[in-house]
């Protein structure tokens, strides 16, 4: 990208330096050819939808001009909040001392609930490395993750079917139909209840498969 003078756009929705919802130790990536995009929504104020761009000054000026045209009246609350935090460095303390520990505690609790809800079901949890999601793999799931999504939706639980994360694949790899992504960002009661329902529907799918073979 540098050799061809093509800017490298990095959408760092959960990475460092803000909001830094990344649990393993990492190094922040940036140079003059990188456009690093961050979001103020992880402060718990998603309605502000304030974007933070770290880039070369000439790119910042171009984005500012474009934004003035596309968004005729952009909100000023978000920029007003974040400007002072960037100037005094408190935005980094907020990431490391408040936001990341908060989600680390939530993911630990979510893993405990998943383990309890799935019991003896063939469920594996992808190592949580950050963001606000858990990936669950149900090996040998008798239905597709899309079908599981539809069943869960009928019961008021929303997940993301794993097969949508494998675009363009032509070979019949069953793994892509056996995984779902769940969010643990909501309140504890809702997350625990949703995980319990997921366990019930997955158990139902396996039970139906056994019944058909008997």
Cite the ranges covered by each PLM segment.
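PLP-dependent class I/II
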Residues: 1-214
């Amino acid at each position: 990208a540098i050799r061809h003078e093509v800017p490298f756009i990095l959408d760092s929705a959960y990475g460092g330096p803000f909001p830094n919802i990344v649990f393993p130790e990492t190094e922040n990536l940036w140079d003059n050819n990188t456009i690093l995009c961050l979001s103020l929504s992880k402060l718990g104020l998603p309605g502000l939808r304030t974007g933070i761009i770290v880039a070369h000054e000439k790119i910042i000026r171009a984005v500012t001009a474009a934004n003035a045209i596309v968004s005729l009246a952009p909100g000023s609350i978000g920029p007003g909040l974040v400007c002072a935090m960037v100037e005094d460095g408190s935005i980094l303390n907020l990431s490391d001392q408040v936001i990341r520990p908060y989600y680390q505690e939530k993911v630990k609790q979510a893993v405990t609930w998943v383990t309890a809800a799935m019991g003896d079901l063939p469920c594996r949890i992808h190592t949580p490395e950050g963001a606000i999601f858990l990936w669950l793999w149900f090996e040998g799931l008798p239905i597709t993750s899309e079908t599981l999504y539809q069943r869960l939706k009928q019961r008021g639980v929303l997940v993301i079917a794993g097969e949508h994360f494998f675009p363009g694949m032509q070979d019949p790899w069953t793994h892509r139909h056996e995984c779902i992504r769940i969010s643990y960002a909501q309140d504890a009661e809702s997350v625990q209840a949703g995980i319990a329902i997921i366990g019930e529907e997955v158990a139902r799918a396996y039970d139906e498969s056994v019944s058909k073979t008997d």
